[in-house]
Amino acid sequence: MATEEMREKSLKREAESLWDIPPESYASKACSCMGTAAQLVMVAVLGSFQFGFNLSALNTSKAFIILDFGWCKDENGGHYSDCDTGLVYGSLINTAVFLGACVGCLLGGRLTDFGRRASLIFTHCVCTLGCILSAAAEGFPTLLIARLVVGVAVGMFTVCVPMYLSEVTPDDRRGYFGTFHQLFITLGIFFGTLLGLAFGNAPAGDEVYEVSTFQQAWWRVMLGLPAVVSLLAIWLLWFVFPFETPQYMVEKKQRAKATALLREIYGRDNVDVEIQRIVTSRYQQKIQRAQQLTVWKAIVHPTYRSVILLACLLSIMQQFTGINVLVANSNNLYSSLKLPQDAVTGLTVGFTALNVFLTVITIPLVDRLGRRTLLLFSEAVMFVAMGIAFVANLVDQSNTAVQWVTVACVYVFIVGFAVGYGPVLWIYIHEIFPPEIKQGAASLASALNWVATVAIVLPSDFLLKQGFSVFVGICTVALAIIFVVTFIFVKETKGLSIEESPYFKGKSRALGSPSAFRMELNSSPSVPLTRGEGAAASAEKGMGLTDAAAMNGGRGVSDDLTKGTEVV
């Protein structure tokens, strides 16, 4: 009887997948306390958690990996963690995640063309493979390859998760749900460092240290644990939520399914306008693709050049503030200050906990205070914090008071970063580009951000070995430069469309303005919504592409996909 019932359910699911037949409900009945959109968001941000966890997991475990593999040995065969070989190998495995992410973020856009849900499943599979290989590594080569694979998954998550979120959430709550991506990144970072407390006191670099059996096993558990999260996500996406986003359904001519899902997402029966927006967005994207300027042509065009260079500079300099050194290498940073070893991991956990807290409370500030204001405030706070730390360490780094003042400055730094430069950058670089260069220019800025991350994280062990003042001096200079650039060149975009943007006011663009684009749409025939009532409603109202474009502010639905996203 049970077998027959399972067979019937299997046949029903197969029929639904082959034909445009919506299921009875898209939401999981096991979690009736949450709406459909909230359930889908919580599943998607498991990828965001993986992003954060894998960036920070090596922070607390790297020293024990060096000891376990015996990369540093004295003449008596004793293991310690501070030698040239350990420094090089440790830096490379730490940076491998960021290097892999450079590749992954470039692959992510292509991957989503095969389906938003499918792209998440594939990325979680890659992440699972990388984490299992990390846990099973037997030496430097295998661990390096494993961390590169994990990095590719991290890079793909930066593209796939925001896109999925933007397409399964209501328009009026997209900003709210979009911040869950950044929130779960910071939660992943927090738990990645929190689990490091189980190691006990961090070993001093020149101390001969015998790694316990528990410590030998625990670093493997930490690097392999994300595989469990990914397997859970794969199971949920495969069996509990086995459907694509409304946008992808419409693209695959599954209008009835898309309509049914949108009704659950919005909590109302009439979603004709939402379906029309999706159809309109697809037409817009087709026209924009046909008219798309390559980023290289745009750079030599006088109208676009300065904006692209500004976005790239903002993106690169975000990493030269030192933020990802604090995320990925803070244990070494605190050790370079000669702080007590029993306080090092605790300080790292406190730092990441503060990051989570600030991410939660800063969510509404971006729209209230404006982009330029927050950037300037953020950069000023970070500059003052790093400047004080730099001067104090130049005077007397060995002084206990100076050491704790430096720790306080690091904590003030994260306050400044979390309320401005962190989240605002990713909103800003997706607001200042017009449609004809947006995809290429934003991708270039994002890729350069990852390249800059590699450039600052890779040598961070060597810089910190020379003393904290060298590292903090570089960050202070970078912050001074970017504050001046922001003050002179960055213009406020809060509440403005591209048509009103001060960057293009009075300038001739290669493809004209959104007004011209709407005129082009005006000549297009009305697009039917769905078979049945949607099409009838459209015919009755006479809603064409131009009407829906106006309702959507002249933007495609997917334009908001990366707003509110931060890469730390």
Swiss-Prot record:
The lineage of its organism: Eukaryota, Sar, Alveolata, Apicomplexa, Conoidasida. It comes from the Eukaryota. The chain crosses the membrane at residues 33-53, 87-107, 120-140, 143-163, 183-203, 221-241, 307-327, 346-366, 375-395, 407-427, 444-464, 470-490. Belongs to the major facilitator superfamily. Sugar transporter (TC 2.A.1.1) family. SUPFAM superfamilies: MFS general substrate transporter. GO terms for cellular component: plasma membrane. One of its GO terms (molecular function) is hexose transmembrane transporter activity. Residues 54-86, 141-142, 204-220, 328-345, 396-406, 465-469 are extracellular. The gene is GT1. Sodium-independent facilitative hexose transporter. Can transport D-glucose and D-mannose with high affinity, and D-fructose and D-galactose with low affinity. Can transport D-xylose and D-glucosamine. Its main location: membrane. Inhibited by cytochalasin B. Pfam families: Sugar_tr (PF00083). Keywords: Cell membrane, Disulfide bond, Membrane, Sugar transport, Transmembrane, Transmembrane helix, Transport. This is Hexose transporter 1. Residues 1-32, 108-119, 164-182, 242-306, 367-374, 428-443, 491-568 are cytoplasmic. Disulfide bonds join C72-C83. It catalyses: D-glucose(out) = D-glucose(in); D-fructose(out) = D-fructose(in); D-galactose(in) = D-galactose(out); D-mannose(out) = D-mannose(in). Active from 32 to 42 degrees Celsius with D-glucose as substrate. Optimum temperature is above 37 degrees Celsius with D-fructose as substrate. Loses activity at 24 degrees Celsius with D-fructose as substrate.
